């Protein structure tokens, strides 16, 4: 299993790495390493034929999965959804979910969790252009 490591930090920022994604295995949670305060971020990798060993849902957090490489199936409330490199999947807290790698190469993804309905400012309303 890969571990995230902090590379650099300064006032208001942290930089970390999980290493080479082509050799990444397992799961690495980043919240504690990078100090996020409004979300959990993790990298995950499933080997060919491997699946998460349980179905689960969340109490408050929605999840956003960004598939970086590989192919797989997300089973969402009993519906099988095929995913591949470039797929983006948003899952509400109450939806039962499980992920499986169906390709010949690992399924590598980023998962971002944040409290559902908590976003009040976003790029165009929160960003400030500096001169």
Regions found by a protein language model. Give the residues of each.
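A short, N-terminal "cap"/entry segment at the start of jelly-roll beta-barrel domains
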Residues: 1-38, 124-131
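Double-stranded beta-helix
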Residues: 8, 98-131
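Conserved short histidine dyad/triad with adjacent acidic residue
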Residues: 23-29, 42-58
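Short histidine-centered beta-strand/loop micro-motifs
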Residues: 31-33, 53-58, 100-102, 121-122
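Short, charged/polar surface micro-motifs in flexible loops or helix N-caps
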Residues: 36-39, 47-51, 71, 115-118
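Short, conserved beta-strand element in jelly-roll/cupin
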Residues: 45-47, 57-75, 114
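Short beta-strand His + acidic residue motifs that chelate non-heme Fe in jelly-roll/DSBH
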Residues: 54, 74-75, 91, 97-103
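Short acidic-glycine-tyrosine-enriched beta hairpin
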Residues: 78-93
């Amino acid at each position: 299993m890969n571990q995230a490591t902090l590379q650099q930090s300064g006032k208001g920022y942290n930089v970390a790495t999980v290493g080479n994604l082509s050799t990444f295995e397992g799961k690495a949670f980043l919240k504690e390493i990078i100090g996020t305060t409004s979300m959990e971020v993790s990298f995950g990798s499933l080997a060919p034929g491997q699946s998460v060993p349980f179905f689960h849902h969340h109490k408050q957090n929605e999840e956003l999965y960004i598939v970086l490489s590989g192919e797989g199936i997300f089973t969402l409330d009993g519906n099988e959804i095929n995913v591949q490199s470039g797929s983006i999947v948003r899952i509400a807290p109450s939806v039962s979910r499980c992920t499986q790698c169906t390709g010949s190469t690992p399924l590598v993804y980023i998962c971002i969790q944040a409290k559902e309905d908590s976003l009040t400012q976003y790029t165009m309303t929160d960003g400030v252009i500096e001169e």
